[in-house]
Amino acid sequence: MDKARHQQLFQHSMEPGYRNETVPQPFMPDQTGSASANMRPPNSNGSDVKAVHNFSIQTGEEFSLEFMRDRVIPQRSSNPNGAGDMNYNTGYMELRGLIGISHTGSECASDVSRFSTVENGTSDIERTNSSLHEFGNKLNHVQSAPQALLSKDSSVGNLHGYKNTSSSASGSVTAKVKILCSFGGKILPRPGDSKLRYVGGETHIISIRKDISWQELRQKILEIYYQTRVVKYQLPGEDLDALVSVSSEEDLQNMLEEYNEMENRGGSQKLRMFLFSISDMDDALLGVNKNDGDSEFQYVVAVNGMDIGSGKNSTLLGLDSSSANNLAELDVRNTEGINTIAGDVVGVGASQLMVNGFQQTSAQQSESIPPSSSLHYSQSIPLNAAYQLQQSVPPSSALHYPQSITPGSSLQYPQSITPGSSYQYPQSIIPGSASSYGIYPQYYGHVVQHGERERFPLYPDHSSNYSAIGETTSSIPIQGHVSQQGGWAEGYPYPGSTPKSTQALAEEQKVSSDMKIREEVEPENRKTPGNDHQNPPQIDDVEVRNHNQVREMAVATTPPSQDAHLLPPSRDPRQNTTAKPATYRDAVITGQVPLSGIEDQLSTSSSTYAPVHSDSESNLIDLNYPEPEQSSQRVYCSERIPREQLELLNRLSKSDNSLSSQFVTSESPANTAQQDSGKEAVGKSHDEFKTVNDDANHHTHKDVETIFEKVGVSDETLESEPLHKIVNPDDANKNRVVNGADTEIGVSNLSHVNAAMSHVIPEEQASLQGDILIDINDRFPRDFLSEIFSQAISEDTSTVRPYPHDGAAVSMNVQNHDRKNWSYFQQLAEDQFIQRDVVLDQADSRIPSDRKDGGESSRLPYVSPLSRDGISTNLANPQLTLGQDYGGNFSEKDGGGTGSIPPALENEQMKVTESEEFGAMVENLRTPDSEPKDEKTETRHAALPPLGSEFDYSGLQIIKNEDLEELRELGSGTFGTVYHGKWRGSDVAIKRIKKSCFAGRSSEQERLTGEFWGEAEILSKLHHPNVVAFYGVVKDGPGGTLATVTEYMVDGSLRHVLVRKDRHLDRRKRLIIAMDAAFGMEYLHSKNTVHFDLKCDNLLVNLKDPSRPICKVGDFGLSKIKRNTLVSGGVRGTLPWMAPELLNGSSSKVSEKVDVFSFGIVLWEILTGEEPYANMHYGAIIGGIVNNTLRPTIPGFCDDEWRTLMEECWAPNPMARPSFTEIAGRLRVMSSAATSTQSKPSAHRASK
């Protein structure tokens, strides 16, 4: 609006005939009374409006105070104006309408609309004065708007920023669009009918120009709701699960076209636009009651666009306040990778945050430590911090509640924090420690209620040198064994102590030699009420502490409102005494601190503060007792963040860690078998377990009492070696990967601690002791594992109990020793492929390799087979950078080609088992592959082998389609359809492969085509009586599709036979079938071929001979092309057979022993005829397998030989599993014994 218009506007308003005469002025009062376009608000005091001549643009004079007060504060009913309009509202409401403020009574500054439309079309008013938004952000409520906006430098014209548009008044109405705009709420199912509806938030009607650009709309949206990250709109008549995203000019034009079409059709409905922030999505996740059912939960997750547990959902934009003073509040946020992690191991010097575009330096020490195994937590536990804290416990809080703390490797840590808070931890390796359980990054920390922002001080050591939580804090060791205690006043130091300054405390921090963390402190941000000591700033949602190998123990406190009765009672009489101040169980931790494996499942609480405790109680054991007492089974710690009480209770049934709280039991303490902490370790004195690194531990070792669980493991498999054999921490980390990738061998990362060998075998090395070395990169699609984990971490499996430990099985309830490095479950947006019926293929998964040397090897159309020594020449070496995902904060660049094992034969009678529960998530991850647009191009690529390929296709038989006859369909899926047919009179299985398997960019098409022909060529060379024969390829199928022709097995899959009531298989036949399968797998492994999907569905049988059934291995080839189309179906149908090392991310390499694990489950299937874990959700299955707390229940009628073989096959440690050669030999012996036993009674009857 230029100056001339201002002058014209106010000159007209001051003319004598302004009130009663009809003059051609743009701001003539609206005769309809619907809205006033007059510049001056009407008089509401009932008196005649006098012409005001004391305001002028030229003179700068202002209106009188009475004039403004009468028009701002609605006191009386409006009276007719001079023109006889009886419909005027009060001056307050008039002003609200003029400046575009909604009538909803919102106090949000962003309610101020940028446009206001006069319904009668007499004027087109636009706000152009930027000061309105500037002042608007400072408003607390609408009533103060005029006062805030009327500064001494503002004229009335400038105040509202209107321009004269009378010349185009008629066109201005049609050039505007009114749409509903909702923000601040979330989409949730309505209780009862589960119909989705938008809950909470605000809804306004906004007006935008039809020619508005996307950038202008974005600016307007940010003025309305500055936290907006996602814009979607809803077409009238559509449900909330059909929202349309707007992210570009084209999307905006489409939305406006939809508006035009709707306007042409008539009706009163309006387009509705939704503005979502990241915190909105996360709040929706927290608000979902998982008890309502998995499918409903998945649905809500998908509709809200939530990436469960993902750091992508965490943002600084979700903060209630983003001021620099609330630094701790910002500390736990992560804005799309801006939040960097301090630590040399990831190449970052300090923890820094970006707050609304301004860089802030974290005042907190950024430390990171992976969970350590049970044999090594003396490295990380403060030596004399615990007992001194216990001595200072006030009498009012003398109860000690054991928290089921098992040795460190049994502890689980929350994988995700809260919506909008995701402090990410690098994969730092502490000397002699590594992850045995838990996902990188692990979240430990001090959980503070959202909105209430309580302060929880930490108490680092015994010398009364305490630090508030916002300062550079000491860590609570992950392996610390603590009991709970409450009752300290919030915000104050431990009784009898005086806080120490941040700088002084920082000087006392001792960090291990290989983890130099830079500390950056901002004391000015910390104020302690009532004293001059520093205290933490306000914390939103969660205060997270990285835990490096620091030698102090931090103890948080909870407010007095935390009820002591919510804590589990102690069952160990020793727990209720303070006589043993030197033991770790005397350490006290209170508050919402889900540390050291504490499961904070608060099911009933009248307080918003949730004390951290576990459903399962453990009696902590120290080595002063010759025979350790029994500890509970496994204790997992999942993050529970109390927000509002209802959301807290809803949250309790969920875990943000697929490895945590999946199987928390509420039973009395029981034995826990652990692989690494052998019986010898329990009885050893703590001097054997002390750390030699005195620089990292300034306390004396004599104060340490190491706590171990009782181990129920057989002596021959679990032998232990004292940890003092490893002296130099660097010796334990020699496999460290540059740039913070998978650091390998901590002392606790032991696959075997074998006393006979007198050295430590690292996990990476131990897991690769098979004949074949497979790079998982070649088998799993990138987001196959990561997405099922992101779904599984939210599953409600608290009612699932671990497989009972009956003392006979080594593999029951043993801890898994693989590192839970989830760095490769990071950037999931590239391929978006999910495996079904997974012949697990992952050429594009880019799982981090363990090579230190850089470089990328070119990706081949088909990966080369491995040599017999199991060493691939094409290992990928992805370089890792800090990422955004909570799963490990590492995003991988494109890796090179990967070495793999040539896959073999594809089963032709595939049994299609579509998983409905997985479909909702998958469909929101990617759209199903559509049919190729250019069918000629696609057909040419698919039907012809690639030129210049390294494979020789001359030996591959090409079968003409006209020679085939399809008889009946056996099954179908996203991969294709299988038919029973005839090939020149012989029974065959024909698998028609969909063209969508080869869809994609030209380079992708070429790669997939090469993979198909390369695998087909290999399959044609596999010949064994217990392997399904591969006959050839059909390249001239209908529409140019490809097909494979394989041997047909009359009775189909073994699973089908087992469930048939008319088929009875005695023990001898079952042994024969198992033996045949073992022979077939032995042959495949001899050809460097790993199946990856061995199960009864993929074992084909022929039972025509009643005395000798025949079993053949199938469905293990052509796996790569499945990756593009295998969605939603096979995850649930394949997980029970997957080995832990395939799921836990411990290494990018696995051995052929993954098939041995699957075979153990197959033996159980053959024995029972049932499907493993039939009634369990796949999330529970994942957690159980990875934690090694879940195996099929062995029936009582199982004989010892079969039981032992099964348990050895599904042992957690790949090295402990037998080879198929050994398995086949043992089954042969068992079969011979069964045959002789069966023949003896027959001979006896014949002699009679």
From Swiss-Prot:
Modification comment: Hyperphosphorylated in response to auxin in an ABP1- and TMK1-dependent manner.
Record keywords: ATP-binding, Auxin signaling pathway, Cytoplasm, Kinase, Nucleotide-binding, Phosphoprotein, Serine/threonine-protein kinase, Transferase
Domain PB1: 176-278
Description of activity control: Activated by auxin via rapid phosphorylation downstream of ABP1 and TMK1 signaling.
PANTHER family: F3O9.7 PROTEIN-RELATED, SERINE-THREONINE PROTEIN KINASE
Entry function: RAF-like protein kinase acting, together with RAF24, as a central mediator of a fast response pathway to auxin involving proteins phosphorylation, and leading to rapid cellular responses including membrane depolarization and cytoplasmic streaming. Required for general growth and developmental process.
Protein name, entry field: RAF-like serine/threonine-protein kinase 20
Lineage, broadest ranks: Eukaryota, Viridiplantae, Streptophyta, Embryophyta, Tracheophyta
